[in-house]
Swiss-Prot record:
Single GO biological process annotation from the record: proton motive force-driven mitochondrial ATP synthesis
Membrane protein topology class: Peripheral membrane protein
Origin organism lineage: Eukaryota, Viridiplantae, Streptophyta, Embryophyta, Tracheophyta
Highest taxon of the lineage: Eukaryota
Annotated ATP binding sites: G172, G173, A174, G175, V176, G177, K178, T179
Record's GO cellular component terms: chloroplast thylakoid membrane; mitochondrion; proton-transporting ATP synthase complex
Function according to Swiss-Prot or TrEMBL: Produces ATP from ADP in the presence of a proton gradient across the membrane. The catalytic sites are hosted primarily by the beta subunits.
Localization: Plastid, Chloroplast thylakoid membrane
EC code: 7.1.2.2
Protein name: ATP synthase subunit beta, chloroplastic
UniProt keyword Secreted, yes or no: no
Amino acid sequence: MRTNPTTSPPGASTIEEKSTGRIDQIIGPVLDVTFPPGKLPYIYNALVVQSRDTDDKQINVTCEVQQLLGNNRVRAVAMSATDGLMRGMEVIDTGAPLSVPVGGATLGRIFNVLGEPVDNLGPVDSSATFPIHRSAPAFIELDTKLSIFETGIKVVDLLAPYRRGGKIGLFGGAGVGKTVLIMELINNIAKAHGGVSVFGGVGERTREGNDLYMEMKESGVINEKNIEESKVALVYGQMNEPPGARMRVGLTALTMAEYFRDVNKQDVLLFIDNIFRFVQAGSEVSALLGRMPSAVGYQPTLSTEMGSLQERIASTKKGSITSIQAVYVPADDLTDPAPATTFAHLDATTVLSRGLASKGIYPAVDPLDSTSTMLQPRIVGNEHYETAQRVKETLQRYKELQDIIAILGLDELSEEDRLTVARARKIERFLSQPFFVAEVFTGSPGKYVALAETIRGFQLILSGELDGLPEQAFYLVGNIDEASTKAITLEEENKSQK
């Protein structure tokens, strides 16, 4: 007899142990269920309602236990619409938390919060399943070595490097290249690190999820001909889903990523778009459960909920999960509790700039606004650190001079400032790069640039050795040797035109 139910054990129970209850009350996505004495389910257990509505349509609703109300009653939150449910319907306690399929069979497929495929490609051929509620890795399992996660993208690796097993915040409005940057990272981790990616669409637009899927198929990140060779699994809980689904879809994606890290011992990229929607869904559920709201109307358990997700994203001795999280900042207020709680967990920020995108510089990563805790001499080495600082100083000086240039023109600047501007413009263009996933749109072959090559290139620009080359030669190239080759080509083209 279970008299003191708390959080359930990870293993599923046998059919004999499954107890049944009855729906007592339905308020929107929240159900109150009464069970026989001593048969109460554990907190976080999955409950299933299988019945028929008044039109004789099949109902199949999964819920998650959130509260114990006393008098043999529990309060659960539905993971799908509660249309057609009625008081008195039978509810089955599955005896375990929600479990989702994991492993190689998930690659190239789209799942919902319950781990059910929603891409009309048939069932998933995976015998392995993991519960979505799992403990964070123990301290003894964590990899304490600070190491850089090389992405092959110059601006990221030089100025705001990612930490292996770290968490990165991605800030950017619509149409500045967030999706293309995400797809390039998925492509590069597969090629350079032999890793895979999991994309968690949390509370965002269904259209965007569909566009991402179509673009991934077009760029080859999802291989339609041989689905197992795809590099990414997609988990969607979009804006139209009930708050329970939006609150748990991040955990479903994370659970799939944990399998690749812990069992396959791979480096995994986990994308969460958008982490703010995870908090927002938690706030909605908290209100539905009758909890007293905290600051700005958010749930009182905000920090705990965020921590339980973020602490599972870590680098262990087996493999790593590096997470890139799109962060929506409500009303651009960085002190709002949702983004403020997220910032406490981030190791780096990648800020996309509309100004750079309008100049045609892609990736449109803002070199001055993007930051990383990894950019320290003891971690990246003196050469990398000093090069990055000099690049930032040059770009900052150029930014300060732009007002003067706009009013008086370049001719009014001192010789030293004119040289700084010329080098800054070369640096700005050299920070652009052709992407593999954009080949189908641009016709330019993609480039993966190793960190050592990136540092060498910027050192040559800063030293003045390349002052004679036109700035156009640095635009959309890989390493610095390609810029020199492009300069010769441009010169020959100019001669032939004359």
